[in-house]
């Protein structure tokens, strides 16, 4: 399944999201959701400890001036790669 987080992780039910992901699922952080990928934060550590493949939409990190602060343990992707993930994961859950 493809999960997307588009709101700030401080305004999302992160605990429920983490309980909902299964091994092999993908999570794309976009819009204000990219805040969750900030290096050194508690949120990124919780996400990395889960079984989910973690992706961050690069144009959204660039728009917020955060690209250099994003954890090295996530994959920065562009729109084409995001579309490819939607093809690979026909089921989607938006958070």
Curated annotation (Swiss-Prot):
Keywords on this record?
Cytoplasm, tRNA processing
Matching entries from InterPro entries are given as: DsrEFH-like, Sulphur_relay_TusB, Sulphur_relay_TusB/DsrH
The record's section on Pfam families has: DsrH
Tell me if Disulfide bond is a UniProt keyword of this record. Answer: no
Biological process (GO), any one:
tRNA wobble position uridine thiolation
Which GO cellular component terms are attached? Answer: sulfurtransferase complex
Matching entries from Gene3D superfamilies are given as:
DsrEFH-like
At the top level of its lineage, which domain of life is listed? Bacteria
Cellular location(s): Cytoplasm
Relate the protein's function as given in its record.
Part of a sulfur-relay system required for 2-thiolation of 5-methylaminomethyl-2-thiouridine (mnm(5)s(2)U) at tRNA wobble positions.
Whom does it interact with, and what assembly results?
Answer: Heterohexamer, formed by a dimer of trimers. The hexameric TusBCD complex contains 2 copies each of TusB, TusC and TusD. The TusBCD complex interacts with TusE.
Show the PANTHER family listed in the entry: PROTEIN TUSB (PTHR37526:SF1)
For this chain, the family text in UniProt reads:
Belongs to the DsrH/TusB family.
Protein's name in the database: Protein TusB
The organism is Pectobacterium parmentieri
Q: Which gene encodes it?
A: tusB
